[in-house]
Amino acid sequence: MLNDVYAAQKDGCEKAIASLKRDFTTLRTGKVNISILDHVMIDYYGSMTPLNQVATVLASDASTISITPWEKSMIKTISGAIQAANIGVNPNSDGECVKLFFPPMTIEQRQENAKHAKAMGEKAKVSVRNVRKDANDEVKKLEKDKAITEDESKKGQDEVQKITDGYVAKIDALVKEKEAELLKV
């Protein structure tokens, strides 16, 4: 019974970590990452479609993203969608593809992104703590229903806290690693 509670808690915490890693991909570091365009949606024959489903998106070098649409008629639509997404660059089109040139990041931009990384880490910790609360509530419910003893309940809550501490430490390590990457010039 308690093992089910622990498994559910670990699953919830893993989801929080996965969400944090996904959020980190939206932060720009020294080199461009094509995942910055993951949220860009294109009006493709009346339905909103992710950019990567209508074009090939590649990082040409450390500061350039090249977008080659599968249909040349989509170039104007893609350029408009990128401008509307407000990612901090203007698209340049040569008739064949759309290129995005990212200027080098300033120290202020790097520090701002490091702050965002910290805030994302705090949000993930809140998620982990909410999962802990749910797990503790489940342990207390088992005790109330006489499925486990008071001692087992106490041990169960201690184990829930150990699991939480482990995941909070993982989040702290991920945030520290991301901050170092962001602040590295």
Curated annotation (Swiss-Prot):
Family classification: Belongs to the RRF family.
Region (Disordered): 135-159
Record-given protein name: Ribosome-recycling factor
Record SUPFAM superfamilies: Ribosome recycling factor, RRF
UniProt cross-references to PANTHER family, sorted A to Z: MITOCHONDRIAL RIBOSOME RECYCLING FACTOR PSEUDO 1, RIBOSOME RECYCLING FACTOR
Keyword Protein biosynthesis: yes
GO MF annotations in UniProt: ribosomal large subunit binding
NCBIfam families noted in UniProt: frr
Matches recorded under InterPro entries: Ribosome_recyc_fac (IPR002661), Ribosome_recyc_fac_dom (IPR023584), RRF_sf (IPR036191)
Pfam families, alphabetized: RRF
Function per UniProt: Responsible for the release of ribosomes from messenger RNA at the termination of protein biosynthesis. May increase the efficiency of translation by recycling ribosomes from one round of translation to another.
Subcellular location(s) of the protein: Cytoplasm
Keywords, in A-Z order: Cytoplasm, Protein biosynthesis
UniProt-listed GO biological process terms: cytoplasmic translational termination
GO cellular component: cytosol
Main localization, broad class: cytoplasm
